[in-house]
């Protein structure tokens, strides 16, 4: 399995870091060498760290924890939403709003506003308003859905946060660290691993690389979620007997 996975990682370019002049020295332990002035990531170190991260995330799901997937740059946005939905978890795939974790009380108020607008759009309230009022509410609804749609049913802070590109999502990492929420992240050679509890060294820019990571995670976590769900159903049936 690991040999096949390593071959797939090489095909996807997971081992390609950034040009050497952009490197972060803190990533030195995970670098294999240099080719054409580009750092090459040591996949023999990436693989076990990726496995460790997968196992810990599976434990989170097994014990009813909530995982927040974060990837707001264009190359990660669609895949981040897809993996979260595949395992019934949560996501932020557009702009990270400052205080999204550390100011959860205010964020929750915005989520309630979003849900209220959704209800209004379905219960006939919009039919009683002027076209201008409807347009304004639809614009606000779309804006809130765009920024909060992936966490509107989270119901509280997550138990873990998974990030694509630590440099890009440094605010999310800082907030998670402040609250003691474990951080899992793909970390490239130009980024700092500081604040990341579960480091996965790898290319965090190429779409093929990002998709490979997230597809594997999706398979593993959705399977875990399905098994947990089936276990709950079985327990309930046994109670009824």
Swiss-Prot record:
Alphabetized, the UniProt keywords read: Ribonucleoprotein, Ribosomal protein
Q: Which Gene Ontology BP annotations are present?
A: translation
Check the record and name the InterPro entries matching this protein: Ribosomal_uS2 (IPR001865), Ribosomal_uS2_bac/mit/plastid (IPR005706), Ribosomal_uS2_CS (IPR018130), Ribosomal_uS2_flav_dom_sf (IPR023591)
Q: Which GO terms describe its cellular component?
A: cytosolic small ribosomal subunit
Q: Does the keyword Ribosomal protein apply?
A: yes
Tell me the domain of life: Bacteria
One Pfam entry for this protein is Ribosomal_S2
Task: Name one molecular function that GO assigns to this entry.
Answer: structural constituent of ribosome
Please report which protein family the annotation says this sequence is part of.
Belongs to the universal ribosomal protein uS2 family.
Entry protein name? Small ribosomal subunit protein uS2
UniProt organism field: Buchnera aphidicola subsp. Cinara cedri (strain Cc)
